[in-house]
UniProtKB/Swiss-Prot annotation:
GO terms for biological process: 2-oxoglutarate metabolic process; NADP metabolic process. The gene is sthA. FAD binds at E36, R37, Y38, H39, Q40, V41, G42, G43, G44, C45. Conversion of NADPH, generated by peripheral catabolic pathways, to NADH, which can enter the respiratory chain for energy generation. One of its GO terms (cellular component) is cytosol. This is Soluble pyridine nucleotide transhydrogenase. GO terms for molecular function: dihydrolipoyl dehydrogenase (NADH) activity; flavin adenine dinucleotide binding; NAD(P)+ transhydrogenase (Si-specific) activity. Its main location: cytoplasm. It comes from Colwellia psychrerythraea (strain 34H / ATCC BAA-681). The keyword NAD applies. It holds the Pfam family Pyr_redox_2. InterPro entries: Class-I_Pyr_Nuc-Dis_Oxidored (IPR050151), FAD/NAD-bd_sf (IPR036188), FAD/NAD-binding_dom (IPR023753), FAD/NAD-linked_Rdtase_dimer_sf (IPR016156), Pyr_nuc-diS_OxRdtase (IPR001100), Pyr_nucl-diS_OxRdtase_dimer (IPR004099), STH_gammaproteobact (IPR022962). It is found in: Cytoplasm.
Length: 466
């Protein structure tokens, strides 16, 4: 006789991965409970990561646009905003997202339970509620979608009011004139753009020799130049030795012997999977040193009935990918396998100012693989739409095979790059000869549009062939 359970599936975490799984399972008529320890749904993506940082960036971008446009700024009186000023917009967006996502669970009859989840065994979860009560629920299958949190080294005092990570920075109570950002990855680079756009002095400490070294070199160089040109001081190849703090300042001592003083420190160097409080051992699981879980192609852990998706399994650690992982894993939970797979070329969007987006191979990767490629480029400053909107900084680069004309990679730098990239991505996904740069020459684009950059870049690249 088959054992009875309270639910078909319990999902731990309401971020993109948990949501994607819950919606798919609900559509398949499964009884689903989703557990969230925070008092609102949405996970780190909605409350501390993707949504608030992009909302902050949007406000700063519009501020920069206003101050740099003579049509609006005829008296040369610079409009100034503080970090607290723009937080109100981010908070409003967060609440809209919470309302929207709460509606998803209600309409699809997914039971939302607030509390801290931990394993009792591979089928049973203990939930500690905010009021101190504890309940136990069980399910045939369980999904871990708990996301990640900022890495906090033990020797840095994050309780100090002038030391922040990428979560706590959203609770900034003062108006810093100078900020040190340690870690020049995606998060650090985005916040460097935000603070500098507000007129705050920024020291960006990079532990590597290049900014965002996974990007195409031209994109990385473009970002470095524009951050430098805006006044951000970038220090490459540096590591923190210790942090000295006072009531209203921090002094960062580097292993190279340098030291810097600022109003506050934003530590943005690495993230850790949220598994420490789950009592994984009771379920027969063990996380690695970064708090992450290993899974197979169907997102199944080494315990057959337990699956994991999103940041808690590591790469690619993108909200977009997490949602798809949840959806794919849900299919595997129901059908024992899933025909759908995460696409190979996942687009990357980095919301610096200007923003960056890419899909496919970089020039470095193609050169190393000895693939005969050609390059097509379009400069935004030559596009009528860019001239109209006064967003002249940026470019689009298409990498394609010289012989087959197959598109191998697309890299974009500039306003709306993360939107523009999807036009190229759609063509790259075509099969049976549909993936060709000639598509952009043969189709008709609306005029004037930023999308026209694809036609310009395609013509530029094809004209290089001989």
């Amino acid at each position: 006789m088959e054992k009875s359970f309270d639910y078909d599936v319990i999902i731990i975490g309401t971020g993109p991965g948990g949501e994607g799984a819950a919606m798919n399972l609900a559509k398949r008529q499964k009884k689903v409970a989703i557990i969230e320890r925070y008092h609102q749904v949405g996970g780190g993506c909605t409350h501390w990561g993707t949504i608030p940082s992009k909302a902050l960036r949007q406000s700063v971008s519009r501020l920069i646009e206003y101050n740099s446009n003579p049509l609006f700024n005829q008296n040369e009186q610079v409009k100034q905003l503080t970090f607290q000023d723009i937080l109100s917009h981010a908070s409003a967006v967060i609440q809209k997202q919470v309302s929207l996502r709460s509606g998803f669970y209600n309409r699809n009859r997914v039971e939302h339970i607030q509390g801290q989840a931990s394993f009792i065994d591979a089928h049973t979860i203990s939930i500690s509620h905010p009021d101190g009560s504890v309940e136990k629920i069980s399910a045939k299958q369980i999904m871990i979608a708990t996301g990640s949190r900022p890495y906090r080294p033990d020797d840095i005092d994050f309780d100090h009011p002038r030391v922040y990570d990428s979560d706590s920075i959203l609770s900034l109570k003062h108006a810093p004139q100078h900020v040190i950002i340690y870690g020049a990855g995606v998060i650090g680079s985005e916040y460097a753009s935000i603070f500098r756009g507000l007129g705050v002095k920024v020291d960006l400490i990079n532990t590597r020799e290049r900014l965002l070294s996974f990007l195409d070199t031209e994109m990385s160089d473009s970002l470095s130049y524009h951050l430098w040109n805006s006044g951000v001081v970038i220090r490459h190849g540096e590591e923190i030795e210790r942090v000295e703090s006072s009531e209203d300042a921090v002094i960062v001592h580097l292993k190279s012997g340098k030291k810097m003083r600022a109003d506050c420190l934003l530590f943005a160097n690495g993230r850790t999977g949220n598994t420490a409080d789950l009592n994984l051992a009771a379920a027969g699981l063990k996380a690695d040193g970064r708090g992450q879980l290993k899974v197979n192609d169907c997102y199944q852990t080494e315990v057959d009935n337990i699956f994991a998706v999103g940041d808690v399994i590591g790469y690619p650690s993108l909200a977009s990918a997490a949602f798809d992982q949840g959806r794919i894993a849900a299919s595997a939970m129901v059908d024992s396998s899933s025909k759908a797979k995460l696409i190979v070329d996942i687009p990357t969007g980095i919301y610096t100012i200007p923003e960056i987006s890419s899909v496919g191979k970089t020039e470095q990767e193609l050169t190393e693989a000895k693939i005969p490629y050609e390059v097509g480029r379009a400069q935004f400053k030559h596009l009528a739409r860019a001239q109209i909107s006064n967003n002249l900084v940026g470019s689009l680069k298409i990498l394609f095979h010289r012989e087959t004309k197959e598109i191998l990679g697309i890299h974009c730098f500039g306003e709306n790059a993360a939107e523009i990239i999807h036009i190229g991505q759609a063509i790259m996904q075509q099969t049976n000869g549909g993936n060709t740069i000639e598509y952009f020459v043969e189709t008709t684009f609306n005029y004037p549009t930023m999308a026209e950059a694809f036609r310009v870049a395609a013509l530029n690249g094809l004209n290089r062939l001989f």
